[in-house]
């Protein structure tokens, strides 16, 4: 469907240019008690910091918006998909909640992508909880079949998990533990919890 979008309170309303009925997709529901069967997927913004295929670790300054090259990965690994963070969230390690977006083409640092989640990789690093959301672009019809982890090939999940388990291996003072996949419902609950941590810290 080719359409135009507009914000209406907490929703994005997409209207078909041909004039069919509008469909509202919720942007974010911070107090949601967990997904229920038949729910419209939660849509949220992810800011890309590192494009797919890069060994460069870029970080965006949340105050100035500047993109800084933090380092090149010490290992020979490369980011499997675009990697960034969910806006207005706070993870257990004190940073915004991390997200990996399954796009067919890389974007660029600072690009904002409306996403929906399909699962999450529970991890811990030297700073604490370091969970990684696995997302797709909300409007990508090619990925519409991806709704939960069961829809992703098992080998691809293993590749992604392996990357996050080893990409810090050669860096002094860095460590990674864990690496267990959880599904869509658990991931949405963590998004809401991260959003609440952020809002509680900015009252």
Where are each of the predicted segments found?
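Hydrophobic N-terminal alpha-helices or hydrophobic patches in metabolic proteins across all domains
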Residues: 31-203
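Cationic, low-complexity basic patches in intrinsically disordered or flexible, solvent-exposed regions
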Residues: 7-10, 28, 33
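N-terminal hydrophobic alpha-helix used for membrane targeting or insertion
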Residues: 5-8, 76
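Compositionally biased, low-complexity segments
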Residues: 7, 16-17, 25
């Amino acid at each position: 469907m080719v359409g135009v979008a507009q914000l209406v309170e907490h929703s994005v309303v997409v209207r078909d240019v041909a004039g069919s009925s509008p469909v509202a997709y919720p942007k974010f529901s911070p107090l949601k008690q967990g997904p229920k069967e038949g729910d419209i997927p939660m849509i949220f913004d992810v800011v890309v910091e590192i494009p797919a295929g890069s060994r460069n670790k870029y970080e965006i300054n949340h105050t100035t918006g500047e993109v800084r090259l933090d380092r090149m990965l010490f290992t020979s690994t490369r980011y499997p998909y675009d990697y960034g963070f969910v806006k207005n969230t706070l993870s257990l390690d004190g940073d915004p909640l991390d997200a990996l977006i399954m796009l067919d083409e890389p974007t660029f640092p600072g690009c904002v992508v409306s996403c929906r989640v399909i699962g999450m990789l529970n991890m811990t690093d030297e700073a604490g909880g370091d969970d990684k959301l696995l997302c797709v672009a909300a409007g990508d019809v090619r990925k519409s079949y991806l709704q939960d982890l069961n829809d992703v090939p098992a080998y691809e999940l293993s590749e992604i998990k392996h990357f996050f388990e080893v990409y810090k291996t050669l860096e002094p003072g860095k460590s990674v533990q864990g690496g267990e996949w959880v599904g869509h419902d658990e991931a949405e609950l963590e998004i809401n919890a991260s959003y609440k941590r952020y809002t509680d810290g900015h009252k």
